Amino acid sequence: MKVGIIMGGISSEREVSLNSGKSIINYMDKNKYEIVPIVIDKKNDVFEKVKDIDFAFIALHGKFGEDGIIQSVFQTMDIPYSGCSPLTSGICMDKDISKKLLYSANINTAEWICIKSIENIDYDYLEKMGYPVVVKPNSGGSSVATTIIEKSEDIEEAARLAFNYDEEVMIEKYIEGDEITCCILDGTALPILAIKPNKGSFFDYTSKYADGGSEEIVVEFEKPLQSKIEEISLKCWELFKCKGYVRVDMILKDKVPYVLELNTLPGLTKNSLFPKSANGVNISFTELLDKIIQCSM
């Protein structure tokens, strides 16, 4: 089977995507698959470059990767691909819509507002919500242009930074707690990881992708809490109609999990969370890639 590794792209996460793509190429079973590296530099590239492949392994991140657009292209071209449907991808990429769905399903998530311009900032509401808050692009990823703000005077500058990356900006109540993530592969929860950033105060871009940027360890909580985290993660999987593989990021405060977001195309670099979680149940990187392909077909 000829597998195209789709990487690069046009988003701010291009570098991360290229690293994911290289890792996938290095670890994919070359005895089982014919691997075709496909670097996307502009949107039209996809039509020409993917013509002869049997399966698209999407290693893109951000816009034109995780937002459902390239998934729609592959569906139109009758090419099976890794991960979620266009609809699920688009909804999960939009943090505001995702949080509205989480809220409607009684899944804990931090309080938030979403703004479309600087003039939209409701300082009175933010005062009631309470500081600190997190300011970030509504449809961004990899914590690009994400800032923790302690006081109202600094909101505008952080919002302007985030508006460089998206047309909408989310301002979310900052919950101080332990960062955890639950990776789900084909509807099965893998070991939970706890994330301890060594660089920066939260799991930002540097923590995620720099060597030594963070420490991620498999954790097992007491049974009731462990079950609760897994149950919430699987509820998210069902709620958003996920497929293939997804990562559910959370903050744990006073033994209460708050869902931050769902990642429908989790990073697959050597520093990424998904391979580390899979390794916790003795699934090698090569086996993980094979399982992703099989459950996405």
UniProtKB/Swiss-Prot annotation:
Is the keyword 4Fe-4S assigned to this protein?
A: no
Name the GO terms of the biological process aspect.
Answer: cell wall organization; peptidoglycan biosynthetic process; regulation of cell shape
Kindly report the protein's main subcellular placement as a broad class: cytoplasm
The first-level EC class reads ligase
What Pfam families does this protein's entry cite?
Dala_Dala_lig_C, Dala_Dala_lig_N
Question: GO molecular function terms here?
Answer: ATP binding; D-alanine-D-alanine ligase activity; metal ion binding
Q: In which pathway does it act?
A: Cell wall biogenesis; peptidoglycan biosynthesis
Cofactor(s), by name: Mg(2+); Mn(2+)
**Where is the protein localized?**
Cytoplasm
Entry binding sites for ATP: 126-181
Any idea which UniProt keywords this protein has? ATP-binding, Cell shape, Cell wall biogenesis/degradation, Cytoplasm, Ligase, Magnesium, Manganese, Metal-binding, Nucleotide-binding, Peptidoglycan synthesis
> What does the note under cofactor report?
Binds 2 magnesium or manganese ions per subunit.
Residues given in the record as Mg(2+) 1 binding sites = D249, E261
What family does the entry list?
A: Belongs to the D-alanine--D-alanine ligase family.
Show the catalytic activity: 2 D-alanine + ATP = D-alanyl-D-alanine + ADP + phosphate + H(+)
Cite a GO CC annotation: cytoplasm
Q: Where is the ATP-grasp domain?
A: 99-294
Role description: Cell wall formation.
Q: Could you tell me what this protein is called?
A: D-alanine--D-alanine ligase
Detail which positions bind Mg(2+) 2: E261, N263
Which NCBIfam families does this entry report, sorted A to Z?
D_ala_D_alaTIGR, PRK01372.1
The gene designation is: ddl
User: Could you say which EC number(s) this protein's record lists?
Assistant: 6.3.2.4
